[in-house]
């Protein structure tokens, strides 16, 4: 039987999953995206060249990797076509290697209009979405009025589905959100054109995955966002609209629990968050700004500055538990170079008591005060180090402490953005 590894974020997203997926895709059978949409921004740096992927799996830069988009992903036709065109212009063959589930829902123009209008109306209480229609597309999926890849090849059915959806959404847009309606004919024509474009890539992704496992091939499941943004397990309502945890890999790709052999959780050596929502260890000071500047903490999809803070072990332990994480990958260790001291949150003060468990609601998280353990920093440069013994003693001690506090071994350490700036302590596929 083949080996399957799930790579997912163990914080609030932006942990560096794309680089690690690319690193692990050597001699891979396939890489599959299973949730989210083009709100993801996976940045790869190979030989100094930077590539940002939003929808297409990060394995696309490996010539022999099959890339799959599962039924759990919501697809923007315009974003997908743009990303394919950019990659192929740079010499990367995409369409012959990309397979898309016909059950994947589409992000339609009215989803984008709804997303942006709602955020404007919410004002200071906005969730902080990317405004790209992700949430409304998932809403339609659950409400059974979504339009899927498969529907594009049945014009009469598509017309009926689209008219029904627009009757509903245009009423909300014009009467409640006080914005413009979305035009039926333009939307219909664009959908038909995309149907022709995507037809050669439409495939039974679940079937492909089952066959690859029987053939003994390696498969990597690439998560987007992070576990603490999960619609069920995150800081609701400040969450994304899909299951970013390991269960999302099963449902969003169409495989059983026995198809997963290893879960790799990606976490920065500190913590970041984009948009609204609780963040107990946030540093709204010059230390936080310094981390932001050194770590280039600006969104790959939106360019928004990320909120920065100390490592939160309480939150990380929750991610480890709900995902059954087998091993951790700690990224951006080099960003902490030169800091005199480091802090790690090991517990919260909540309702007058100390707890090592995170609350289950956003308001509870907001009321938590972090309890810190302090560690000495290091003055040496760790950028690009690929050997554990070459790390400064204080950096090694910091990592070993994270490992012990989280109750999970560290399998990989990343010391820079390039594919080669990595040390693999234990290969997840070994």
UniProtKB/Swiss-Prot annotation:
Cofactor annotation: Mg(2+)
UniProt xrefs under PROSITE patterns: ADENYLOSUCCIN_SYN_1, ADENYLOSUCCIN_SYN_2
Residues binding GTP: 13-19, 41-43, 306, 332-334, 414-416
EC number: 6.3.4.4
Catalytic site: 14 (proton acceptor), 42 (proton donor)
Source organism superkingdom: Bacteria
Cofactor comment: Binds 1 Mg(2+) ion per subunit.
Enzyme class, first EC level, given as a word: ligase
Family matches, as Pfam families: Adenylsucc_synt
One MF term in the entry's GO annotations: magnesium ion binding
Keywords: Cytoplasm, GTP-binding, Ligase, Magnesium, Metal-binding, Nucleotide-binding, Purine biosynthesis
Family recorded in the similarity comment: Belongs to the adenylosuccinate synthetase family.
Protein's UniProt name: Adenylosuccinate synthetase
Species annotation: Stenotrophomonas maltophilia (strain R551-3)
């Amino acid at each position: 039987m083949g080996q399957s590894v799930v790579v997912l974020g163990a914080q609030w997203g932006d942990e560096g999953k794309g680089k690690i997926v690319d690193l692990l895709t050597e001699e891979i059978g396939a890489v599959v995206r299973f949730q989210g949409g083009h709100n993801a921004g996976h940045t790869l740096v190979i030989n100094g060249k930077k590539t940002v992927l939003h929808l297409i799996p990060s394995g696309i830069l490996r010539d022999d990797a099959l890339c799959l988009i599962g039924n759990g992903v919501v697809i923007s036709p315009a974003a997908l076509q743009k990303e394919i065109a950019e990659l192929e212009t740079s010499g990367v063959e995409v369409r012959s290697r990309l397979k898309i589930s016909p059950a994947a829902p589409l992000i339609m123009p009215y989803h984008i209009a709804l997303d942006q209008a709602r955020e404007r109306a919410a004002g200071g209480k906005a969730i902080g979405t990317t405004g790209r229609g992700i949430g409304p597309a998932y809403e339609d999926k659950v409400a059974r009025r979504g339009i899927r890849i498969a529907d594009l090849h049945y014009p009469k059915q598509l017309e009926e589905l689209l008219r029904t959806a627009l009757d509903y959404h245009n009423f909300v847009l014009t009467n409640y959100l006080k914005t413009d309606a979305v035009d039926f004919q333009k939307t219909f024509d664009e959908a038909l054109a995309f149907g022709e474009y995507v037809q050669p890539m439409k495939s039974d992704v679940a079937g492909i995955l089952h066959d690859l496992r029987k053939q003994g091939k390696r498969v990597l499941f690439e998560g987007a966002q992070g576990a603490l943004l999960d619609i069920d397990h995150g800081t609701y309502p400040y969450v994304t609209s899909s299951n970013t945890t390991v269960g999302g890999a099963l449902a969003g790709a169409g495989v059983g629990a026995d198809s997963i052999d290893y879960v790799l959780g990606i976490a920065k050596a500190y913590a970041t968050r984009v948009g609204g929502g609780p963040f107990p260890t946030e540093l709204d000071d010059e230390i936080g700004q310094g981390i932001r500047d050194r770590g280039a903490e600006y969104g790959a999809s939106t360019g928004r500055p990320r909120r920065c803070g100390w490592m939160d072990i309480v939150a990380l332990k929750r991610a480890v538990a709900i995902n059954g994480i087998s091993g951790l990958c700690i990224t951006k260790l080099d960003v902490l170079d030169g800091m005199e001291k480091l802090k790690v949150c090991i517990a919260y003060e909540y309702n007058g008591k100390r707890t090592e468990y995170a609350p289950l609601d956003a308001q509870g998280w907001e009321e938590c005060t972090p309890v810190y353990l302090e560690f000495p920093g290091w003055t040496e440069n760790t950028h690009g180090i690929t050997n554990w013994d070459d790390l400064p003693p204080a950096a090694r001690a910091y990592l070993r402490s994270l490992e012990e506090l989280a109750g999970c071994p560290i399998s990989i350490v990343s010391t820079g953005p390039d594919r080669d700036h990595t040390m693999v302590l234990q290969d997840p596929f070994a």
